[in-house]
Amino acid sequence: MTNSSRERKVRGSQIRTSRREKQDKNARNRTEKELTRLENHQTHRTKNGTSKLDERFIPEEQPFIETEAVTQVETRMRRWLDVGRPVHLIGPTGCGKTALAMHVARERDRPVVWINGDADLTTSDLVGEYAEKERISERDKYVHNVVKSKDIVRDRWVDNPLTLAVREGATLVYNEFSRTKPVANNVLLSVFEEGVLELPGQRGKSRYVDVHPDFRAILTSNSVEYAGVHEPQDALLDRLVGLYLDFYDRETEVEIVRAHVDDFDTEDTEQIVRLMRELRERLDVNVGTRAAIMAAEGLTTVDDLDRSILTDICVDVLASKVAQHSDVHELRDEVEATIKGMEGTLS
């Protein structure tokens, strides 16, 4: 055997070894690419590049009334949102906080993400968690008559609303913010101050998400005297712009009721709003604009209205706000006295 043939044999051996190394390397590369794809899955983009935020649930758009009183609050909200500050709307139940927050959020022409706070909400509910499993199956037939099989099962991270909003530059509407326990909301501190969201439970570089420059937040809360309200920690409140709201003026409430209740006479609308505003002053329970809307809806079903029917409707609307059955009798007495004492009440 010549030296050249030996060299060819050696060269052939090297080629076969190199080919196996290349196959193994390609297999590793495919696996690494697939793992990278999974790491990047939380960007939540569809194939055509549109955001999956478009598919997120947000409350159905409701009629919104623009009066001078409403516009003044809107202007104040936009002032702070324009400079990147989160806005915290605080006020009694039924004064229109949520409707205002959703309207201003939609007007920004950015995606809107909705969170509804409650005592059971956790940090994971806000940011996400490893909530799914994904299996990767690989079949390598590169070498003739040789099949390599490999299955990889790994946890898959699923983003929740806050993370989606931060990534996409959406407007976050966090309704009933103060009903969530303060410890769950700690994650907001770095979002509002450092512009970084930390994902507890994530690993490696994926643990931190830079806040999109278009991200904004609007939070709503009932006043602290309401049951079930947790007082947020001072460090977080220090980073929020607080706007305290009360019930709108009579003219605005009339327009709101008219917008929500079709086929209801204008004069009747004015009278039911007047009645509810009077009850608001006399009763210990909260009588919001929503109560006036509900009462007007009930009145649209009545052909021959009398004082007894009007009393029934008002008591039905407000009875869920009293603590026990015995309080309903006192409520009815107050409603009857108020109706009797008002001139020009619906008749």
Swiss-Prot record:
Single GO molecular function: ATP binding
Organism: Haloferax mediterranei (strain ATCC 33500 / DSM 1411 / JCM 8866 / NBRC 14739 / NCIMB 2177 / R-4) (Halobacterium mediterranei)
Keyword Ribosomal protein: no
Something else known: Encoded in a 14-gene locus called mc-vac.
UniProt keyword list: ATP-binding, Cytoplasm, Gas vesicle, Hydrolase, Nucleotide-binding
Annotated protein name in UniProt: Gas vesicle ATPase GvpN
Segments of this protein annotated with the region Disordered: 1-50
PANTHER family: MAGNESIUM-CHELATASE SUBUNIT CHLD, MOXR FAMILY PROTEIN
